[in-house]
Regions:
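Hydrophobic alpha-helical transmembrane bundles of multi-pass membrane proteins
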Residues: 1-176
Length: 176
């Protein structure tokens, strides 16, 4: 309910004429009224999840063996399959947020691809520079970072912006 009150927007179908723009914007959420654009609702989803994760991590405390034992995944193959499925599914999430098959949907689709690819490359390059080689786990992590980073902007930036967001997300999440 809080995310709805803060971010709510009637959508493009509510704007039937120029005379109703102010009336519709007055009903919108606070952040929308301040001029924020969140194409696919990624900011709402990921900020809420991040806050919940931080609170949960603070309450649970450090992992047993943190910093002493390797926390490698059980199966890198399944990790890559999972991240690939996530990447493919994210196309529907971002492009589907346009609510119709139009230029915004195509832009969101293309931006999702380029930002995620850029994040994979930047994470892999950063990891190779720091550790001497890139890893499959790093590539999967970079893909998730790129997907999360582009979601709020997928239909609002050009391809250059998507590449910049992806590159920045890959490096920031590697060293963040």
């Amino acid at each position: 309910p809080i995310a709805h009150m803060v971010w709510f927007w009637m959508g493009p179908d509510a704007y039937t004429a120029a005379s109703v723009v102010d009336e519709m914007n007055a009903k919108a959420g606070f952040i929308w009224q301040m001029g924020a654009l969140d194409f696919a609702g990624g900011t709402v989803v990921h900020i809420n999840a991040a806050v919940a994760g931080l609170v949960g991590a603070y309450m649970v405390g450090k992992r047993v063996g943190y910093g002493k034992e390797s926390m490698a995944p059980h199966s890198l193959t399944l990790t890559m399959v999972g991240s690939a499925l996530l990447w493919v599914g994210w196309f529907g999430f971002n492009a589907g947020s346009a609510l119709e098959a139009n230029g915004f949907a195509a832009l969101a689709f293309i931006n999702t691809f380029f930002a995620t690819a850029a994040a994979v490359l930047s994470w892999s390059v950063g990891e190779a520079l720091h550790k001497g080689k890139a890893s499959m786990l790093g590539a999967a992590s970079g893909a998730v970072a790129g997907l999360v980073a582009i979601t709020p902007a997928a239909g609002n930036v050009g391809i250059g912006g998507a590449l910049f967001i992806g590159l920045l997300a890959g490096f920031a999440c590697l060293w963040g």
